Amino acid sequence: MIMAGKVMKKLTVSVASLALCALLLACPALAETSTRGAVTKLLIPRFVSLKTSEGNVRRGPSLTHRIDWILKLRNMPLQVVAEHGHWRKVLDFEGAGGWIHYSLLSGARTVMIKKDTVDILDRPLPDSAINARLQRNVLAWLSACELEWCEITADGYKGWAPKAALWGVSAEELFE
């Protein structure tokens, strides 16, 4: 009888695990939003920006780890993919990653233009008037995002850009 109880528990756990896996596969957005950082309890992954004009990116989460490179673009968007104590593992817009101290990061939202050229439009409509044309790797401030469009400001120009042309905002993100 004890054996049957253990088998039943294992079967119940296995069925529950399969159901959870099926749910997460059917709803990728749910899988992404359900991950929280162990330290901050904020969503992982999430986007932040570099607070300073220089930031050391290290091989691991401590001062004893070697510096792999130095970020030199203030307000550069970064994606936090892990947390460990006062350290955040980040990826830049080219996919390079490493660990950076949390004090060098800001919650201010910025994006990089990831297409060769992007028209910044007056309204979030494809046939709207063009306010500016931005080139690849231009840094812009993020103000708001709708389903397919984000309002950005770069070099004094403000307008709407297709979300797919920006790095620093996730596809499902909406905010004002």
Predicted regions and their residues:
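Beta-strand-rich domains and repeat architectures in extracellular enzymes and scaffolds
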Residues: 66-67
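N-terminal signal peptide c-region/cleavage motif recognized by signal peptidases
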Residues: 26-28
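Short, low-complexity, intrinsically disordered N-terminal modules
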Residues: 1-4, 36
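Intrinsically disordered, low-complexity polar regions and short flexible loop motifs
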Residues: 62
